[in-house]
């Protein structure tokens, strides 16, 4: 990754059992917010690059269209203000796709959805929103049903803090939030998915 100028052999991981591998990097700033990273898997079959399985953010290079893992500083300064939110027992669900919520014919953002669409949903009497396509997925046309990174919110709609902003605002308006995640539709891609991550199909 960025931390070692993308040298694939400088930082080998150590196998600690049960399919778990680890790497210890010295220094508080060995990895930083926005640092791009990948994992190289050298198996009997082939050497492949992958986005780390537990990455919290994956971003797409605008020139190559290739996805890469990006380190997220977990010490986010986002300030939640929804402590008093209590979900209602009267569930009335509005299903929505963040990217397709605007009329302009472009991909919308988490913040645009929060500021422009949530008031309409609330005014229409809904109590819950169900968001499609939240987990990272390389093929936009899949509506998020070809997930590549199960722990990363889709970066094409904004940052993790932008998604927190949306959820926080929904809760402030009394709306519960459900994330539509389908585990049975993982993408078959190797570079940005979980296929061949352990060296097998």
Residue ranges of predicted features:
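The feature marks proteins involved in alpha-glucan
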Residues: 5-95, 100-105
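Extended low-complexity, serine/threonine- and proline-enriched intrinsically disordered segments
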Residues: 1-3
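Substrate-binding/active-site clefts of carbohydrate-active enzymes
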Residues: 59, 81-88, 97-201
């Amino acid at each position: 990754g960025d931390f070692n100028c993308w040298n694939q052999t400088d930082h080998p991981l150590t196998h600690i059992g049960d399919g778990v591998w680890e790497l210890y990097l010295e220094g508080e700033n060995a990895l930083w917010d926005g640092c791009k990273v990948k994992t190289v898997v050298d198996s009997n079959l082939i050497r492949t690059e992958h986005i780390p399985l537990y990455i919290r953010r994956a971003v797409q290079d605008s020139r190559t269209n290739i996805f890469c893992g990006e380190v997220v500083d977990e010490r986010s300064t986002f300030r939640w203000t929804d402590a008093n939110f209590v979900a209602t027992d009267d569930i009335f669900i509005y299903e929505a796709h963040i990217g397709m919520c605007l009329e302009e014919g472009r991909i919308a953002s988490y913040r645009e959805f929060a500021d422009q669409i949530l008031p309409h949903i609330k005014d229409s009497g809904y109590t819950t929103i169900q968001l499609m396509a939240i987990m990272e997925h390389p093929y936009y046309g899949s509506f998020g049903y070809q997930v590549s990174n199960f722990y990363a919110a889709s970066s094409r709609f904004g940052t993790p803090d932008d998604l927190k902003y949306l959820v926080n605002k929904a809760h402030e308006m009394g709306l519960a939030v459900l994330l539509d995640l389908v585990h049975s539709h993982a993408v078959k891609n190797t570079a940005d998915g979980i296929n061949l991550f352990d060296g097998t199909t």
